[in-house]
Structures are given as C-alpha cells and as structure tokens.
Amino acid sequence: MMVFVVFVMCRYKILEELGDGTCGSVYKAVNLETYEVVAVKKMKRKFYYWEECVNLREVKALRKLNHPHIIKLKEIVREHNELFFIFECMDHNLYHIMKERERPFSEGEIRSFMSQMLQGLAHMHKNGYFHRDLKPENLLVTNNILKIADFGLAREVASMPPYTEYVSTRWYRAPEVLLQSSLYTPAVDMWAVGAILAELYALTPLFPGESEIDQLYKICCVLGKPDWTTFPEAKSISRIMSISHTEFPQTRIADLLPNAAPEAIDLINRLCSWDPLKRPTADEALNHPFFSMATQASYPIHDLELRLDNMAALPNLELNLWDFNREPEECFLGLTLAVKPSAPKLEMLRNVSQDMSENFLFCPGVNNDREPSVFWSLLSPDENGLHAPVESSPLSLSFSPMQQHTVGPPQSSGFTMTSSMQPNMLDRPWMAVSAPFQQSHYL
C-alpha cells in the first residue's frame, strides 16, 4: 500500500530571519499559494505528540482569544517532530518605533496606542488570561494598528498559584513580582501598561533598573517607599532590608514627563501603584478621563498669527537611546519587520513657544484680504484633505535566499546614537523635555 505524505511547510518560502530567542526563532515568509506574507515561529524543542502541541500555553491562549488587537494565529503545523506557528505579519514593534523617533509622540498618538492595547488586554482578562510579559517589544504595529503578541508566558487566571518567579522584562515587572510573590493577579499587566504609557511620553523607560534591587530602588525614587500595611508583599523585602531604612529623593512623575497632560499623569500614578488592588482594570482604565480629553487650542488663532513672523528654526532633539539587553531566560522572538514608513510631506508651521502643544497646517493657497489663514489641525482623520495615511515601503516578495537585515535608527539630522548604555531619567530629567509634536494619521 502506497502512503502519500503532504508536507504543509512546503507551502511557505522563508524570506528572512526576524528574531531568535530561547524558545524558538521567527522568520518572515510568504505563502506560495496565496502570496500572503506571514511570520513563522519555529519552536526549538522537539514535539513527538500532537497533545504536547495543543497543551502549550501560547496555543491554548491564542485559540481562545480572537480580537482585533491581539495577534492572530493562523495555523499550527507539526512536521518531522518540529512545531511551527503561522502568524499574521506585522511591520514594526513599539520598541523600534520609539527607538527611531526624533520627536515625542503627540497626545493623540499616545491615546490611540494605549486605547488599542487596553482593548486587547480587557478582552484577554475577560476570557481568563493575563499576559505577564507586556513590553514595547511585544506590541506589534502596522499602519498605526496595534496588536498584543508573544503569549509564551500567558497564564490562565483560574490556574492555581504559585506562579513562576520569572515574568516579564525587568523594567516592566510589577513590585509584587520583583518581591517574588507567587500570588499575583492580572494587575501585573496593568503595572506594565502604566510603565509603557510613561515611556511613550519620555521615549525612555520609567524604571530602568540594572538589577532587581536597582529596579526596586528606582521605583522607590519615583513612588516613595511602599505602605507596609496596605502592601503585605513588601514584608518579603527582607533580602534587601536596607531599602526600608533608606531615604529616597522624591521625583514626581509629573516632573519626569513635563509634556504629559495632567490626565495622563493621573492615569500613570493609578496604574503604577504599589498596591495591586488600587490599580484600575483594563476596562476601568479605558473609562479614565485621559481617553475622553478634547483637543484644545493652546493659544487663540490671533495670537498664533502674530507669532508666525518670528518663527525660528526648529531645534534638534538629541535622543540618547539604548539597546535592550536580553536576559538569558527571555523568550522574545521579535515579530517585527524592518520596513521604514514614508512620512507624508505636509508644509508645517509650528509655534516656537515651549508651551505650545499643537501643530498647525499653513495653507498658502487660502488667503483673505488681510493675512494668511491658519487652521488648527483638529479635524478627525476621516476629513478630506488634511491627513494623509502613512504608507509603508513595498515589501520584496521575491523568492530569494534568506537574508539578514539590520534594524537601526535612521541617520538623519537631530538624531544621534550617543551610547549603548541605558540613560537614567531620574538623573537626567532633560531627556523628557517636550518638543514640537509630530502629526499622524490613524487608520
């Protein structure tokens, strides 16, 4: 009897490697039948039985979670005792977007990213899972659409503690995880949300600890020492008892993020609370006033027009950026493509006042009898003629041998890679100084 074996992975042509981690590697590939570009995650360990595959945390979570802001698992393939996950392919991750920024994000851009992340997180928590590894690298973005990815550490809420000690990259770990509590809840995800929100304003991590002890120290420098009565986990701090007798130079989040609105500061303070019970849920965070802020003009139109003749050249914003040092146990697989979007070219005139927080569009073809007309950029993205969508560079789908591409910051003026070491925002608060905001279009 003749047996025909069909190899599913023959349908896919590997184009390039995107990332490599402890658990596996991720490749950009193309489906030879549909010409769809996908991300293929190949696990490093062998899988001899199908039951082993379907019981993986990542598989169990993604099979239950179908949401516009959660990465879509399209197919699972086991061949020759090797396991492959076929994901939708995204262009960037949030870490690389922040690393390549020359100017801070606008309030609207930050609200858009945060709203999408919280919507995906709310769906996850409602369905009985919490992520445990939220960080900018695991937030994938295409055309301003954000999706949560990498569910290798996802845990069912209903599962019984104790949980594993290692969770999340250190900079986004909640205090109860740093203190080795095994009884943590989905509130650990909400702490990470607060840290990411602050990072979107500062373009540098809020708590960049170099070790677990240094991580707790940096948290204390911003939040102050925990209340031992309302945060029982702090009693397990005996392994670093000196911290309980240390006086910390108090640095308010508002001082670290001078370009953030008061509503944003309030939300960060709530999310980054020592007490997990005081952190809002994802649904509660979505109802925070930060997401209902109306865009307001910082100056009257007449005042703006008087300043147009005195405009100076835009200052360069020098960013000290860093490379994430991968921890040995980390399973980040880098589902991102090195595709640089081409920014729409608009003729922009910006107010030079440091207090200014809005961009303006100058329309040279629209004039009245006295002076040029200046318009606030307050129209919604679907209004005609104001915002142009961000277009990605075309992807090459030629079936060439796998090539390795380098992802790096653009070599443009005003952008300098000065050091590979992590800058400390507490020591160098000028890193968070506001600058003119850049416009974007939301799809």
Curated annotation (Swiss-Prot):
<keyword id="KW-0418">Kinase</keyword>
<dbReference type="InterPro" id="IPR008271">
    <property type="entry name" value="Ser/Thr_kinase_AS"/>
</dbReference>
<dbReference type="Pfam" id="PF00069">
    <property type="entry name" value="Pkinase"/>
</dbReference>
<dbReference type="GO" id="GO:0004693">
    <property type="term" value="F:cyclin-dependent protein serine/threonine kinase activity"/>
</dbReference>
<dbReference type="InterPro" id="IPR000719">
    <property type="entry name" value="Prot_kinase_dom"/>
</dbReference>
<protein>
    <recommendedName>
        <fullName>Serine/threonine-protein kinase MHK</fullName>
        <ecNumber>2.7.11.22</ecNumber>
    </recommendedName>
</protein>
<keyword id="KW-0547">Nucleotide-binding</keyword>
<comment type="similarity">
    <text>Belongs to the protein kinase superfamily. CMGC Ser/Thr protein kinase family. CDC2/CDKX subfamily.</text>
</comment>
<comment type="function">
    <text>May play a role in the regulation of plant growth and development.</text>
</comment>
<feature type="binding site">
    <location>
        <begin position="18"/>
        <end position="26"/>
    </location>
    <ligand>
        <name>ATP</name>
    </ligand>
</feature>
<feature type="active site" description="Proton acceptor">
    <location>
        <position position="133"/>
    </location>
</feature>
<dbReference type="GO" id="GO:0005524">
    <property type="term" value="F:ATP binding"/>
</dbReference>
<dbReference type="GO" id="GO:0106310">
    <property type="term" value="F:protein serine kinase activity"/>
</dbReference>
<keyword id="KW-0723">Serine/threonine-protein kinase</keyword>
<keyword id="KW-0597">Phosphoprotein</keyword>
<feature type="binding site">
    <location>
        <position position="41"/>
    </location>
    <ligand>
        <name>ATP</name>
    </ligand>
</feature>
<keyword id="KW-0808">Transferase</keyword>
<feature type="modified residue" description="Phosphothreonine">
    <location>
        <position position="164"/>
    </location>
</feature>
<dbReference type="InterPro" id="IPR050117">
    <property type="entry name" value="MAP_kinase"/>
</dbReference>
<keyword id="KW-0067">ATP-binding</keyword>
<dbReference type="InterPro" id="IPR011009">
    <property type="entry name" value="Kinase-like_dom_sf"/>
</dbReference>
<feature type="domain" description="Protein kinase">
    <location>
        <begin position="12"/>
        <end position="291"/>
    </location>
</feature>
